[in-house]
Amino acid sequence: MQDAVPRLTFTLRDEERLMMKIGVFVPIGNNGWLISTHAPQYMPTFELNKAIVQKAEHYHFDFALSMIKLRGFGGKTEFWDHNLESFTLMAGLAAVTSRIQIYATAATLTLPPAIVARMAATIDSISGGRFGVNLVTGWQKPEYEQMGIWPGDDYFSRRYDYLTEYVQVLRDLWGTGKSDFKGDFFTMNDCRVSPQPSVPMKVICAGQSDAGMAFSAQYADFNFCFGKGVNTPTAFAPTAARMKQAAEQTGRDVGSYVLFMVIADETDDAARAKWEHYKAGADEEALSWLTEQSQKDTRSGTDTNVRQMADPTSAVNINMGTLVGSYASVARMLDEVASVPGAEGVLLTFDDFLSGIETFGERIQPLMQCRAHLPVLTQEVA
């Protein structure tokens, strides 16, 4: 029997204000986001991600994002030791979808901005204007050291200076097709990119440090942040408030999109049992690697994404916000997320992506006031 959970009620004006976008964080790396021997074990493939994103599109998800990971954490589960590449994956997914927005992640230490500008313009053409770029500076030193391109530990304190120049080159090339930018990190000499994107290219970021938020406030279209805790859907509110305040300083509208994992079942008890089972199988060796790497950056402060990921409180799913409960409970908590000022959307992961998206679309989303504007589905995706 499904737990009885009160349905939130809003006036029409509140309902309009609380409309929230939903995205899926596709599993580009093995095993998704659960570092556990008890979680589903699988390799990343194009076919898996195609099925996930096509289901997400069917259920009116607004966007799909893939990360980039160049070296994993090892351990019994070989966590994230097996990864696809973000731009090529999303190019393929752009070709087999028609409405959902598609975002790839650029590891900016590995790709010159002019190459990213051209790749993005290409996927813009494939997708019909549905593509955007997530820019990351890089925090896991071994990812880059293995290729001989780690610039030294001083980079930790200068990475947003680097990213600022990077995005300025991108904006030049996407906006005018030409760049003569001269900076400390990049020198463009009549650099050209054509054709240009058919629509303004969206840039997103995931800054939680002061420097990261300042960058997003100046250059990003929206900023990702971690949800916090288990079944505490509004605990991220101070982070969203900081982002809102940073954006006010630049006079731009930069909303927060919040990362959550959904573990749902018919009842709260059944969902909680799954969560406890995953925690009991935590891959301690892989988690130790994460903790070790999080301590390498001694220059960016204590409020970075990786510090939160490695917190022992819930490291089994890298400490993203976790919503555990019945379908009605999860719907209620997501409506609470939507009520937080500055929260414009959520980026969701699931313990099992294919069944998770289906149950979300069939059992959770129809109960959400912040998704009440969606049309009723009339047919099932294959």
Curated annotation (Swiss-Prot):
It comes from Escherichia coli (strain B / BL21-DE3). It catalyses: uracil + FMNH2 + NADH + O2 = (Z)-3-ureidoacrylate + FMN + NAD(+) + H2O + H(+); thymine + FMNH2 + NADH + O2 = (Z)-2-methylureidoacrylate + FMN + NAD(+) + H2O + H(+). FMN binds at I68, K69, N134, E143, R159, Y160, S209. Its EC number is 1.14.99.46. Belongs to the NtaA/SnaA/DszA monooxygenase family. RutA subfamily. It is an enzyme of class 1 (oxidoreductase). Pfam families: Bac_luciferase. Keywords: Flavoprotein, FMN, Monooxygenase, NADP, Oxidoreductase. The gene is rutA. This is Pyrimidine monooxygenase RutA. InterPro entries: Luciferase-like_dom, Luciferase-like_sf, Pyrimidine_monooxygenase_RutA, SsuD_RutA_monooxygenase.
